[in-house]
Amino acid sequence: MNKAKVKLDKDLLKASSTMTDHQARFLVDTYYQMQNARIRSSAQVRGLEEEAEPSEVMTWVDEINLSLEENIKKALGKYALGHPIGKWSMGIKGIGPVISSGLLAYVDITKAPTVGHIWRFAGQDPTSVWNKGEKRPWNVNLKTLRW
């Protein structure tokens, strides 16, 4: 079966570099949602293949999910490359467009006088305690990026 493709056109890709941090946060979250959808659909396709029940529609859904995930990653790459810190961070081994964009979108460096403030905001401070009835002392989406 031919690979299904959803192509991100040049105008949308160009617009990705001018997204606001708020818009980038939504796109990072969407990337992780699409990744989960792709993982689920791939598992379903494998399960159907093991039972010798090929499903062209399910395979198509899996391919579309993969294509959407790849296009969102490209858009996030354009966003990250539109910022000097994004370019720098993508040059570090292990940090790609999604993590770089997530850090740019979630971390406001003007509100973090030290790296410890960023660690705490990302849920990395072992002394942080989340008691019942209190607001969570870290950003759950930023904490997801650290994985």
At which residue positions do the language-model features occur?
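Phosphate- and other anionic-substrate recognition elements at nucleic-acid/protein interfaces
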Residues: M1-G47
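Conserved aromatic-histidine-acidic binding/catalytic patches
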Residues: H22, F26-D29, W60, G91-I92, ...
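Generic recognition of short, well-ordered alpha-helical interface segments
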Residues: D29, N36, S67, P137, ...
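Helix-hairpin-helix/helix-loop-helix acidic hairpins
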Residues: S42-V98
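Phosphate-backbone recognition surface of nucleic-acid-processing proteins
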Residues: W88-S89, G102-W147
